[in-house]
Regions:
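A ubiquitous structural signal for well-ordered alpha-helices
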Residues: 31, 38, 50-53, 123
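Short hydrophobic/aromatic-rich motifs at helix boundaries and adjacent loops
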Residues: 21-23, 46-49, 94-96, 152-154
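Glycine-rich phosphate-binding loops that contact phosphosugars or nucleotide phosphates
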Residues: 55-176, 180-183
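Glycine-rich phosphate/diphosphate-binding loops that line cofactor/substrate pockets in enzymes
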Residues: 45-57
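HTH-adjacent hinge/linker in prokaryotic transcriptional regulators
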Residues: 1-46
Length: 183
């Protein structure tokens, strides 16, 4: 009976490995699809305008909240490396106060998966009121924040398509869009 028990244990180990391997392949397939959709959704004419704005702007403010903050901070660091004066904070009051000092020569970049945030809307409206160009990176191009933005880049979010209303968004797509802008 010992040999049979060992075989059974080995079989269960193999199945566990297969399941894990399959899970990894699923993640890869989902991410590939998400990236492809994100890149394909880019309007190159608009992208040229955005890139030219980013090159010529004097100051950049990058705002987000919650899960989007790591992407905002990463963007801020990247753009600082390009010699841009770039500001990003997790504190809403700071973001708002800073937006109220921006000029039309600057740019506000807003990162929001859902495109719905009263605080980010307040910051966007403040910038817009001063004729500052506003770029939104979002999963929902018809959201309230999109209405306030001059430029909208859509990050594909496969999870969101699977479970509507779920914005536990992958940070992959927004990160890739930042990479495109940084490129």
């Amino acid at each position: 009976g010992d040999a049979m028990e060992q075989q059974e244990a080995q079989r269960m180990r193999d199945e566990g490995q297969d399941e894990l391997h399959q899970a990894l392949l699923n993640i890869l397939a989902n991410r590939e699809e998400e990236l492809r959709a994100t890149i394909q959704a880019i309007d190159t004419r608009q992208l040229r305008q955005i890139l030219s704005l980013l090159r010529s702007c004097e100051v950049m403010e990058v705002v987000s909240e919650g899960g989007g903050l790591p992407v905002a901070f990463d963007a801020s660091i990247r753009f600082s490396h390009l010699g841009k004066r770039c500001v990003s904070s997790a504190v809403h009051e700071k973001n708002l106060a800073f937006a109220q000092t921006l000029t039309p020569k600057d740019i506000l970049i807003v990162l929001s998966a859902s495109g719905q945030s009263a605080r980010l809307e307040e910051v966007s409206a403040a910038a817009k009121g001063r004729d500052v160009p506003v770029l939104l990176i979002t999963c929902d191009s018809h959201s309230p924040l999109a209405q306030l933005a001059d430029y909208v880049m859509t990050a594909s979010n496969r999870e969101q398509r699977l479970i509507e209303g779920s914005h536990a968004a992958s940070l992959l797509s927004p990160n890739v869009l930042i990479e495109v802008l940084y490129y």
